């Protein structure tokens, strides 16, 4: 399991905000705190059926997702995140996001290993 923190610009309808993100290979999906959803003015949708998300010390029920836009290495990337009240971080980038964009973590050196910018942009097509 790897954990890395990095500040990234998030683009919302209301404004652009630098957000401290946790890149977490142990989390299958991405999660966002409701306060950040409101601050950015993000679009959300109700899940057809609430899901229970397991956390390190228990679990929580989630009923909404948010469409998120992030800038990484000069490229705009899309993500979908569970809106999770009581989240300890503002944003957690999970394994689905990391795999989709072929992002690797180097926890020992605390850095992200990104594909070439051209290849990262091709994933969006």
Predicted regions mapped to residue ranges:
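A short local loop/turn or secondary-structure capping micro-motif enriched for an aromatic residue
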Residues: 27, 86-89, 121-124
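Charged phosphate-binding loop/patch that engages nucleotide di/tri-phosphates or the phosphate backbone
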Residues: 108-125
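Short, surface-exposed beta-strand-loop junctions and turns on beta-sheet-rich folds
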Residues: 38-39, 99, 118-122
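A short acidic Gly-Thr/Ser loop motif
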Residues: 22-28
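Cysteine-centered loop/knuckle micro-motif
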Residues: 30-32
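Aspartyl protease catalytic core from the pepsin/retropepsin fold
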Residues: 1-22, 58-108
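A compact, surface-exposed functional segment
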Residues: 34-69
């Amino acid at each position: 399991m790897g954990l890395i923190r990095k500040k990234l610009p998030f683009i919302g309808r209301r404004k652009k905000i630098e957000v401290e993100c946790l890149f977490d290979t142990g989390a299958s999906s991405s999660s966002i705190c409701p306060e950040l959803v409101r601050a950015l003015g993000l679009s959300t949708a109700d899940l057809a059926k609430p899901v229970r998300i397991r956390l390190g010390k228990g679990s929580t029920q989630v009923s909404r997702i948010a469409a998120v836009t992030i800038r990484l290495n000069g490229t705009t990337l899309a993500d979908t995140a569970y809106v999770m009240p009581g989240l300890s971080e503002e944003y957690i980038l999970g394994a689905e996001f990391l795999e989709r964009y072929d992002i690797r973590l180097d926890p020992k050196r605390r850095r992200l290993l990104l594909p070439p910018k051209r290849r990262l942009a091709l994933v969006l097509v």
